[in-house]
Amino acid sequence: MAGLKTFDAFPKTEEQYKKKSTKGGLTSLLTYLFLLFIAWTEFGEYFGGYIDQQYVVDSQVRDTVQINMDIYVNTKCDWLQINVRDQTMDRKLVLEELQLEEMPFFIPYDTKVNDINEIITPELDEILGEAIPAEFREKLDTRSFFDESDPNKAHLPEFNGCHVFGSIPVNRVSGELQITAKSLGYVASRKAPLEELKFNHVINEFSFGDFYPYIDNPLDNTAQFNQDEPLTTYVYYTSVVPTLFKKLGAEVDTNQYSVNDYRYLYKDVAAKGDKMPGIFFKYNFEPLSIVVSDVRLSFIQFLVRLVAICSFLVYCASWIFTLLDMALITIMGPKWSLRYQPDDKTKGILDR
């Protein structure tokens, strides 16, 4: 039994023959610290996942889509006419589906005037946090807040604007939302006087699909104002792309869009007769859709990835250490070797 206790199938080098190196220990410590940093980074990616964006052909068949709008127009509600016309030549009068409130026209603070917002794709977590569906409120009689029978009417505001808001379903084909005045372009029972028409406007909300009021869109909080030419024609060209956001089982189906805007002065288009004063939103739906998803590796894939990366780094570190040690010995001599440092017992008489 005593022989078995002293038996070692894998004999090791005795301590008296080992040469310890401070430089070698330092490089090993740096290697281990770097491996620990890599492992910590990989654990962070495993728990946090990564964002994957793909462009795919839109396979869903959608007959209609919803347009959400909240707009201030510098014209009285009585003179406005709102239509939708698409490439099927289907004309839809949508005044009855929208809410119209009389209001004193104004431009809210922090609104971009004669400009549009920068077009960006929002972050996945931002979308999931702000994708709260909502509906527009009911119409209010804004004049009821003021006593118009008061003989002193100097304090009463001028109701020179119209608040247009609501959601309308339209055919999911290329089309145009038209905000014009009665008798302009279409036959109407009443004719709007040109001197009372001003198409300066503020867009608080303009989006496609389900109504998520907290998600920003390129036209949100923008305004167009031209004091000298109130009958200016404003045209917005939008290109709509369906976008699906997916994370941990939650899905948010939205629609992003890019936009270009143009304006035409009444004096320039009146002679041609091809455009009428108003606000026009031309929309086109792209055949592609964007899928933004949060992707996570399985635990087995994570372990294989971590072991492979750490093994490769150790292999590279060993070769770098060996090559650097050989270079130091060749250029500066054996005493600069990273593997060991000779002590006093191993030094020769001439080295002391």
Curated annotation (Swiss-Prot):
Residues 1-23, 333-352 are cytoplasmic. It is a multi-pass membrane protein. It comes from the Eukaryota. One of its GO terms (cellular component) is Golgi membrane. GO terms for molecular function: identical protein binding. Keywords: Cytoplasmic vesicle, Endoplasmic reticulum, ER-Golgi transport, Golgi apparatus, Membrane, Protein transport, Transmembrane, Transmembrane helix, Transport. It is found in: Endoplasmic reticulum membrane; Golgi apparatus membrane; Cytoplasmic vesicle, COPII-coated vesicle membrane. InterPro entries: Erv, Erv_C, Erv_N. A motif (Isoleucine-leucine motif) lies at residues 349-350. Residues 45-311 are lumenal. The chain crosses the membrane at residues 24-44, 312-332. GO terms for biological process: endoplasmic reticulum to Golgi vesicle-mediated transport; protein transport; retrograde vesicle-mediated transport, Golgi to endoplasmic reticulum. Constituent of COPII-coated endoplasmic reticulum-derived transport vesicles. Required for efficient transport of a subset of secretory proteins to the Golgi. The C-terminal Ile-Leu motif is required for exit from the endoplasmic reticulum. Facilitates retrograde transport from the Golgi to the endoplasmic reticulum. Belongs to the ERGIC family. Interacts with ERV46. PANTHER family: ENDOPLASMIC RETICULUM-GOLGI INTERMEDIATE COMPARTMENT PROTEIN, ER-DERIVED VESICLES PROTEIN ERV41. Present with 3000 molecules/cell in log phase SD medium. This is ER-derived vesicles protein ERV41. The gene is ERV41.
